[in-house]
Amino acid sequence: MQDPNEDTEWNDVLRAKGIIGPKAKEAEITEDQIQKLMDDAIQRRTDLPLNEGQRDKKIDDMSLDELDELEDSEDEAVLEQYRQRRIAEMRATAEKARFGSVREISGQDYVNEVTKAGEGIWVVLHLYANGVPLCALIHHHMQQLAVRFPQTKFVRSVATTCIPNFPEKNLPTIFIYHEGALRKQYIGPLELRGDKLTAEELEFMLGQAGAVPTEITEDPRPQIRDKMLADLEDKSSDFY
């Protein structure tokens, strides 16, 4: 019996007369199916089992050169699709990771650099004054974090150039912006733990605001007990 899906003039006539139905469409391959075909191809080449966790680690961590080495005539199309997807992902990551350092800005730069930073951009602004040790400490920590989180824009400015007559007692100050809107602020030594603040603690604080994708989930800052409660407990212990 002739295949009704075969491309022949006779079948075209039968379809035109309504005697046979339209040619069945080829099933579209899904991304999951592409992933499965690719995993099967790689497994045949490496002879290593790929479970769900291993697949994510082994495939997604491959460089473009490693993907090139896996290509052969049978699997070239599948691997090429994945290769193009990886290129797109790398380009997207590179586009986001465009900062990587602490930039010095002036009051004139404030609007363009902070409030008009762009869609999806987090900005961490450090207001400082020269000669203030705590400001130097914050700057040191921010330099480390800027390298680790290049998708976040870290800037600093002499406080009085952005806000005239800004009180030095309120330094250092950190403002956190997202898409031009102020999301969080830390004003003065007390809120920033003075000279006890560590880079890990600052990372956690910025992460809580959403400014950096930190993996720190527990607050590393020491828990300070309420002084009044502690005094009451000390006094009550005198009776025993």
Curated annotation (Swiss-Prot):
Per its database record, what is this protein's job? Modulates the activation of caspases during apoptosis.
UniProt keyword ATP-binding, yes or no: no
Task: Assign the protein's first listed, main location to one coarse class.
Answer: cytoplasm
Q: Which Pfam families match?
A: Phosducin (PF02114)
User: Which protein, by its recorded name, is this?
Assistant: Phosducin-like protein 2
Q: Which SUPFAM superfamilies match?
A: Thioredoxin-like (SSF52833)
Q: Which family does it belong to?
A: Belongs to the phosducin family.
Nuclease listed as a keyword: no
Task: List, alphabetically, the Gene3D superfamilies matched.
Answer: Glutaredoxin (3.40.30.10)
Thioredoxin fold: annotated segments: 99-240
Q: Which GO BP terms, alphabetically?
A: apoptotic process; chaperone-mediated protein folding; protein folding
* Localization (cell): Cytoplasm
List the InterPro entries: Phosducin-like_chap/apop_reg, Phosducin_thioredoxin-like_dom, Thioredoxin-like_sf
CDD domains linked:
Phd_like_VIAF (cd02988)
Superkingdom of the source?
Answer: Eukaryota
Domain Phosducin residue range list: 54-214
Query: A Gene Ontology molecular-function term?
Result: protein folding chaperone
- PTM annotation (Phosphoserine): residues: 63, 73
Which keywords are on file for this protein?
Apoptosis, Cytoplasm, Phosphoprotein
Record the organism.
Drosophila melanogaster
Q: Name one GO cellular component term.
A: endoplasmic reticulum
